[in-house]
Amino acid sequence: MAKKDNIFKAGNFNDLPFSFNEEVTEVFEDMIDRSVPGYKSRLKLIENLGKNYYQNNSSCYDLGCSLGASTLNLLKAVGKKEGQIYAVDNSKAMISSCNSKFKNLTDSKKLDFINQDLEVIEIKDASVVVINYVLQFIESSKREKLLEKVFCGMKKNGLLILSEKTHFDNKYRNQTLFNLHHNFKSKNGYTKMEISRKRDALEGVLITDLEKDHRQRLSKIGFREIRKVMSNLNFFTLIAQK
């Protein structure tokens, strides 16, 4: 059972910017499940899409894999087919936890967890690439370059699965969805103080884009068949093909 997220309760908060350190790693499963609407449904979606788009003897990448939830669903999608899955994260704590948690799977050589910045990882022969709630933590000026590298390293007809938090250019809609997301977290047991403190910690760390900006960026790079396949409040999932 996942350890409960109490990081932002009174007495626990250190007033530092949010980071994926050991403290966050310990409670991340609980944190994301209670904070991101539709999270578990997206994981199942990754498995289903992976089954449809994985090409035999190719590679899958989970970029910004955190604790490997998406990775595990990619592994289910590939099944007994030949290929390799690379799960990459720049958090040493996250990768250390993954290597421990999935030791029986990494020993098979089919799955490889890599502690490296996404800016320097090499992408090659990829038929499925997952980027789940990751671009929002990367400097805005570097997002297009990362996606260009992904595109260049993908096989023809390869699939990108991109999930992000977003905001809206309509102020009323933006505030409405903000309030609904606040209510979602409240119903999942977070106090107003915890929600406020986490929001402050994420200030300047998590920077969202408009959905249309994501679409335009993908189209500019050369992706086609760009479609929204899931939307929950201010979180969405796009798929795009090379």
What role is predicted for each listed range?
Residues 38-56:
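Conserved alpha-helix/loop element of class I SAM-dependent methyltransferases that forms part
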Residues 57-66:
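Conserved class I S-adenosyl-L-methionine
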Residues 130:
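A conserved beta-strand element that flanks and buttresses the S-adenosyl-L-methionine
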Residues 144-156:
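A short glycine-rich, Lys/Arg-flanked "PGG" loop and its adjoining helix->strand segment in the class I
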Residues 157-165:
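Conserved beta-strand signature within the Rossmann-like core of class I S-adenosyl-L-methionine
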Residues 166-219:
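C-terminal alpha-helical "lid/dimerization" subdomain adjacent to the S-adenosyl-L-methionine
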